[in-house]
Amino acid sequence: MTTGLPSQTQVIELLGGEFARAGYEIEDVVIDAHARPPRITVIADGDDGLDLDAAATLSRSASALLDKLDTIEDHYVLEVSSPGVDRPLRTPKHFRRARGRKVDVVLSDNSTVTGRVGETGDDTVALVVRAGRDWAIREIPLGDVVKAVVQVEFSPPAQAELELAGVGGTDKTEERRK
């Protein structure tokens, strides 16, 4: 077994400032000492997502900082990536970053809601949901959300739906709020 790999906490402390200066936040660090070679995966996200160029830049910075650690005795693979589409939305920040995206939400009463993420406050998220042939905004208390996952879409959403979510046009949120 490879020894000398930093802990998750050490990686976050070492890289957190550098990532923050670049406008990103470390969401998670996964260290797999059993892989050959060992693997350190840093999951990062920002308000505008993490594109390939930003991931490459962060990876170079992270590699330089990690290489300075005296505790790493062996070769390792470093990966910097975004959380991915299947990451559950857990915090208000996650919902804010998913604004305009379609989500499936399981509520504490075991009901499910599918809608497009709109404005997110500290305690609630506005979901744009189907109301017959039209769209409506449903306020969901974040405390009632058991699970929320972004859905992959293969066709573009309706313009009215995007507008209610506050993306892609004029914001008519206040005009149509239930």
From Swiss-Prot:
InterPro entries: Ribosome_maturation_RimP (IPR003728), RimP_C (IPR028998), RimP_C_sf (IPR036847), RimP_N (IPR028989), RimP_N_sf (IPR035956)
Top-level division of the source organism's lineage: Bacteria
CDD domains associated with the record: YlxS_C
Pfam families: DUF150_C, RimP_N
GO cellular component: cytosol
Record bears the keyword Hydrolase: no
Main location: cytoplasm
Subcellular localization(s) per the UniProt record: Cytoplasm
Transmembrane segments annotated in the record for this chain: none
Alphabetized UniProt keyword annotations: Cytoplasm, Ribosome biogenesis
Gene3D superfamilies recorded: RimP-like superfamily, N-terminal (3.30.300.70)
One GO term of the biological process aspect: translation
Role summary: Required for maturation of 30S ribosomal subunits.
Listed PANTHER family: RIBOSOME MATURATION FACTOR RIMP
Family label: Belongs to the RimP family.
Protein name: Ribosome maturation factor RimP
Organism: Mycobacterium avium (strain 104)
Highest classification ranks of the organism: Bacteria, Bacillati, Actinomycetota, Actinomycetes, Mycobacteriales
Gene responsible for this protein: rimP
